[in-house]
Amino acid sequence: SEKAGLPAEEAEAYLKKGYSLNDRVGTSYLEKQYEETLQGKRSVKEIHLDKYGNMESVDTIEEGSKGNNIKLTIDLAFQDSVDALLKSYFNSELENGGAKYSEGVYAVALNPKTGAVLSMSGIKHDLKTGELTPDSLGTVTNVFVPGSVVKAATISSGWENGVLSGNQTLTDQSIVFQGSAPINSWYTQAYGSFPITAVQALEYSSNTYMVQTALGLMGQTYQPNMFVGTSNLESAMEKLRSTFGEYGLGTATGIDLPDESTGFVPKEYSFANYITNAFGQFDNYTPMQLAQYVATIANDG
């Protein structure tokens, strides 16, 4: 506002651009991102005074112009419905105890053909007070462990690096490395070992298919109770993350909002971190990144 003036931490930068201390500027969201577009341009005038200090004439050196308008791709009615849906769902989960320790709930809807953002919705849950607050910006600033949704990208990495061929069949089985606890899929104890294709691995959400694919990126083939050499660990993680990045995971999405997070992709990691990353349990991504990932699949890349 004019009363508040320029934000103190950014005042110097704005003054260098010709702003005045009492100018009104955008401080968040799209208003901040498009400040120069929305602000317009002031007229520059030259005032001539007589020897007594009285104004004699005014010459316009530069004509001013109004700021431009921007049109959002977000559909207000749809945005409101998504907001209401999240609120209803999260309150229901709180009531039955399912969201007691949840930090909140977020949703993004994109047009996969154009990339247009149709809705960005979020609810932040304060774990200390239980308070719920709207947090749409959290869809681009907050990061989360994605879980099984990344499995399609893991299989893509297998194809891209020659580890998998087409709808390749592997054995879905309990994975046991020397000196480590078993890694299972959610159904392993009930069904034991059986052959599974790449498509079925996605359909059933197989963890062990992803582990074997990740092991293949290291140049190794799974054998029960095997010793895993880690000389190729770094290059294998680079391959996996490179494919993830092609889907927009761990990279800037290019959305026109300030302060976008590119995710949390630790530089230091162990073999266990790498293996679990193959089924979405290490690197962290924003809801917007995950939406872009799914949109990439939806529009056939």
Predicted regions, residues:
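Small/polar-residue-rich segments within soluble enzyme cores
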Residues: 1-67
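Residues that form generic nucleotide/phosphate-binding pockets
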Residues: 13-14, 33-41, 85, 212-216, ...
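Carboxylate/His-rich catalytic cores and anion/metal-binding grooves
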Residues: 18-48, 89-92, 96-119, 240
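Beta-lactam-recognizing serine transpeptidase/beta-lactamase-like catalytic domain environment
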Residues: 48-65, 74, 99-147, 153-301
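Helix-start/capping segments and mature chain N-termini
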Residues: 70, 74-78, 87-91, 136
